[in-house]
């Protein structure tokens, strides 16, 4: 990774390289499907764009080959007692300091307190269709956060046609994003 000071501050017009923030917590710990998705996106983006990527972590950044490029700035932030608190309090403040142009959330929910364009990836909405597969608190948290995040996002990446149809059905107000 690279130090934030060596990259020029944003925001800029969309004609030059972007400063892209990423909620990179999915790269920490044991790899998940979303973590592998993010790792592959980072590999492609750092090879095929001139953009700078700021990868935000709750605690130390992992030793991950996808981060081993001068185009990725590792931003380990102090953990919070709960992931939602980290996402809504620690992350937005750090993202503002970094002068980002856009923020990418690879796992269903984005920081609602950010005031820059957000792009949120949604892999499925199983917590709506099969609520019994989730604890009461986790299912409720996911259902509340995904709706708010989709409404706050400038763009939504539905990772399958089925998920796109689910989003259009459950959240018709955001289906054009």
Per-region residue spans from a language model:
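Carbohydrate transferase catalytic cores enriched for Leloir-type hexosyltransferases
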Residues: 2-177
């Amino acid at each position: 990774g690279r130090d934030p000071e060596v990259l020029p501050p944003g925001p800029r017009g969309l004609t030059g390289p972007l400063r892209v923030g990423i909620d990179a917590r999915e790269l920490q710990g044991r790899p998940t499907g979303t973590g592998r998705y993010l790792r592959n996106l980072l590999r492609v983006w750092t090879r095929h764009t001139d953009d700078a990527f700021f990868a935000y972590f709750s605690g130390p950044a992992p030793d991950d080959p996808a981060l081993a490029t001068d185009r990725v700035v590792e931003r380990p932030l102090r953990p919070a007692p709960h992931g939602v608190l980290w996402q809504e309090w620690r992350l937005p403040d750090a993202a503002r300091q970094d002068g980002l142009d856009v923020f990418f959330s690879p796992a269903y929910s984005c920081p609602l307190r950010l005031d820059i364009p957000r792009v949120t990836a949604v892999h499925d909405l199983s917590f709506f269709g099969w609520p019994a597969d989730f604890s009461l608190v986790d299912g409720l948290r996911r259902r509340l956060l995904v709706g708010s995040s989709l409404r706050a996002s400038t763009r939504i990446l539905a990772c399958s046609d089925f998920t796109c149809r689910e989003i259009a059905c459950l959240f018709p107000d955001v289906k054009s994003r």
